[in-house]
Structures are given as structure tokens and as C-alpha cells.
Amino acid sequence: IALASGAPLFAGILTGVIGGIVVASISGSQLSVSGPAAGLTVIVFGAIASLGSYETFLLAVVLAGILQIFLGILKAGIIANYFPSSVIEGMLAAIGIILILKQIPHAVGFDSDFEGDQSFIQPNHENTFSALLSSLDMISYGAVIISILSLLIMIYWPGIKKLSAIPAAILVVILGIVLSMVFQNTALALSPEQLVTIPVVGSYNEFMALFVFPDFTQIGNKDVWTVAFTIAIVASIETLLCIEAVDKVDPYKRVSPTNRELVAQGVGNMTSGLLGGLPMTSVIVRSSVNVNSGGKTKMSAFLHGFWLLLSLLFIPFLLNKIPLASLAAILLITGYKLAKLSLFKKMWRNGRDQFIPFIVTVLAVVFTDLLKGVAFGMMIGIFYILRTNLRNSYFYKIEKNGEKNVIRIKLAQEVSFLNKAAIQQTLLKLPKESNVIIDGSDSLFIDKDVLEIIHNFKHNAFSKGTIVEILNIRDHYDVSNTKEFVLKIEKIN
């Protein structure tokens, strides 16, 4: 990700360390893992070029972190509550499909695209599907052997009860290192591009030289502030989406505090910018691997950052022997678990209003990128939510009372402006010479436009031989009634 962003390679590792140690310490999410985000690579690459230096860009990252802290204090995390469930499910399934499609080339030894890329259009000008076709012409048999053996371990090892205490993913990495060393100087040897690449530090002075610090003299540069606002908004949205998604796959169904998460991410980004790292987010792929590997608390995210730091300091040469094919096998299994056929069947059974936003999100994310795809899915999801609300603004019942129809219309708890058209059409279509009862006994709030329609209907009904009775509907409703109701529920819970 650092390479694709045009940043120093060390910046990516540093961001992962800070995401693990700093963010996990503050975050209230038990399973999310933070680090450099593939979704920000285009923004970062363009920002470094437009600002003229990496040091100036780091200042924008620091400011973005401060802005995120303010967003958390202002409780902007509440917007996560408005992400439709079908869209979040679609995002998870799409990430699973992307993992499978993107990791197949790495599994066969074709590593032209950087590890972690989730966009349909790749930096090397290929797309997800053309890269798959290209990989068929560039198969490395050493990588294929490693990935097949790794997949078999990932599938069958957890079923061996006596040995399952050792995580399959750890075994896959060890096997990959051993085989990459065995294959050296043979026809199956892996090229450097097919292995993990991290900076090797030879001394304390070399290690300290890797850190880059922000240029605070550019604090008055408006372009720096523009980049800072862009990173803060995009990173916050991506984080909130990830938090919602991780809560869905949490076996214990815990709910993460979103405002606290924004503060944690802000502190993380501020720290990352001060030390020379990249902007970070909570990352769904790393978080999903955490869940699938048996992580239960945020200690796993913290330790991931801690071990990453120790590995960088003491065994970087060993990490550089890990084949990307081994990591591809782990991510292929993660992708399969996120995009199981059973999920598609479940969403289909849930009805059209759930399945259409779900499948649109899946397709949009796969064929664009995470943020654009989710934004498109959100539009479809919100359309179906509004459509459902319009239809469910009242209960309609016709009873017989002698020769006349008695029509009872019972209004919902919340009747907003959006329900105006549906209620108006219903009232206009009522048969003449009926007795109509409009009951608002369950309503905490009725929009004034809807009240006007009801009173106008009663005023004009006499000319049509219709008798209208209005029950438990006030002349005015205050929005605070709804707030009061919500507060009461929270107190009860």
C-alpha cells in the first residue's frame, strides 16, 4: 500500500504498528484492526504529488487526525446507525468476492498488483478480470505448490482437534518460509517480487533514519487543509463502514462505540503523521482475518501491532522470505467465508427490498471500489427504506356498519412529511358516503403537512356524504416528543 501510494515502504509498516498499538488501546471495538487503507491510495498518491513533498503531506495527516478527534467529540459516529443492514451485508460479500478474485493471481505467482488492492481498476492499468487472465500466462509452479498446500492446511487443519490449538495461518506462513528456502536455486525458485518486502534495519541509526517528520511551516497552506479535510472525511466513513461490518461478523454480537472509534482513529492518524506514517482506517480485510483466526478481544489487534514492531526490528530478513502465495491462501479462505452462497440465499429469502440493495452493493463494490460501491448501494437501500416507510405510515381497515362502510385509518408512531403523498392518495380514493375514523392514538409525531391534509379532508368530506371522526390527534406535535420517547427507551435498556 505504501508503494502504491508513492510513500516510503517503512511508512506502511509504521502505520500498521500504530494502528495496532495506539488505536487498539483507545478503541472500543473488540475485533477491528486498523492500518493503512487500500481505499486511500489514490488520494494519498495525488496529495503527495500536489503538495510537493512527503513532509508537507504528513502535516495534512496530522491535521486530519485532529479533525477526526473533533468529529468523535461532536458524536458524528451516529451516522453509522443509518447504514442499511442490506448494504453492509453486500459490502461484506463484495469484499469476499474481491479477495478471491484479487488473490488468485498472487496464488499462482503473478504479483503485478500490490497486495491489498481492492479497486476494480488497478494502478498497473489492468482491471480485476484482465489481471486474472494475465496470471494464466505467468504461472509460477513454486507459488502454485505453496498456495495449494497452504489451502489444504487452512481447510483441514482446524478439524484436527489435538492440533487445532496451533493456528492454521501460522502453520501456513512457516510452511511458506520453509518451501521458499527449499526452492532456492531450483526451477521452482520464487522471485523477489513473489515475496514479502519490508525494510531491513541494520543499526539503531538506520532505524531512526527511517522516520520522517511533518513540515509545520506549511500550516497556512490551504491545499494542506483541503487534503486534511478529504482524508478525515473519507477515512472516517470507511472506518464507520468497517466497524458496522465487523460487528455483524462478531460471534458475540457486540456493538462498538462509533464516536470513540473516531477519536481512536484520530489519535492514530495524528501519531502516524507525526512519525512519518500513512493515514489509516479500520480495515475490513484485516478485521475479518482477525475474526476467522479466533480473535475475541482487542488484545489481538494490539499484539498484532506489537509483533509487527518486534519483527521489523529483529527478524525482517525472515519476514522477507514469506511467499505472497502463502498469504493469498489465507485471504482466499477469508474471502470464501465472507461471500458464502448461503448469505446470498438468506438475502434472497429476506425479500426484494433486502436483496436488491444487497446485490447492487455487491456488484457496485466489485466493479468500482469500496466507497463508490457502498455509496451507490446506500442510494438504493435508502430508496427501499423510504418506499417501505411510505407504505407503513398507517393501518387501513374497512368494517361494515349496516349499509355504510366504516373505514378505520390508524396512524403509525411516526408520520413524517414523506408519508404525505401516500396518506393523501388514500383519503382521495375513499368511497363516498362512508364513515371514516382517523386514529392517532399511537402517534408520537405527525408532520404539520399531514395534519393539514387530515383537517382539509374532514372539512370537505361533508359535501361527499362522508362522516369523518378524528381521534387522539392534536393540532400540533413537537419533535421533542420523539426525543423523549427515545430517551425513555434508552433508560429502560
Predicted feature descriptions by range:
Residues K337-I492:
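The feature marks cytosolic C-terminal regulatory regions of anion transporters and related permeases
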